[in-house]
Amino acid sequence: MSAKTDEILESLKSLSLLEASELVKQIEEAFGVSAAASAGVVMAAPGAAAGGGGGEVAEEKTEFDVILESFDAAAKIKVLKAVRNATGLGLGDAKALVEAAPKPIKEGISKDEAEALKKEIEEVGGKVTLK
């Protein structure tokens, strides 16, 4: 690596979790990309591989996908805000996701996190399923 990339890497290592989160948001805004989309793809692969065995019924599912099925038209802005808060998406990406329902909001998350997200979105007028 070059000296410049080494220096950047060392700076990143010293960031707190909050600072790293803020940095990700700034990078998403500056470059028009979404870290959540690529993380969702990466996280979906292990879940798909685990589901391939299919023989053991006794094993409890540990990864869940939160699917926005629909929403009340009057609550669209509230649902949009809840989706943005949960995913970290920009306004345009979150709006496209909400308007394209049924669509996955988050994939490969824990049961507790999935149920909390479902409750949050249903409280503002969205209809959500867990898969």
UniProtKB/Swiss-Prot annotation:
The keyword Ribosomal protein applies. One of its GO terms (molecular function) is structural constituent of ribosome. GO terms for cellular component: cytosolic large ribosomal subunit. InterPro entries: Ribosomal_bL12, Ribosomal_bL12_C, Ribosomal_bL12_C/ClpS-like, Ribosomal_bL12_oligo, Ribosomal_bL12_oligo_N_sf. CDD domains: Ribosomal_L7_L12. Keywords: Ribonucleoprotein, Ribosomal protein. It holds the Pfam family Ribosomal_L12_N. One of its GO terms (biological process) is translation. Belongs to the bacterial ribosomal protein bL12 family. HAMAP family: Ribosomal_bL12. Homodimer. Part of the ribosomal stalk of the 50S ribosomal subunit. Forms a multimeric L10(L12)X complex, where L10 forms an elongated spine to which 2 to 4 L12 dimers bind in a sequential fashion. Binds GTP-bound translation factors. PANTHER family: 39S RIBOSOMAL PROTEIN L12, LARGE RIBOSOMAL SUBUNIT PROTEIN BL12M. Forms part of the ribosomal stalk which helps the ribosome interact with GTP-bound translation factors. Is thus essential for accurate translation. This is Large ribosomal subunit protein bL12. It comes from Parasynechococcus marenigrum (strain WH8102).
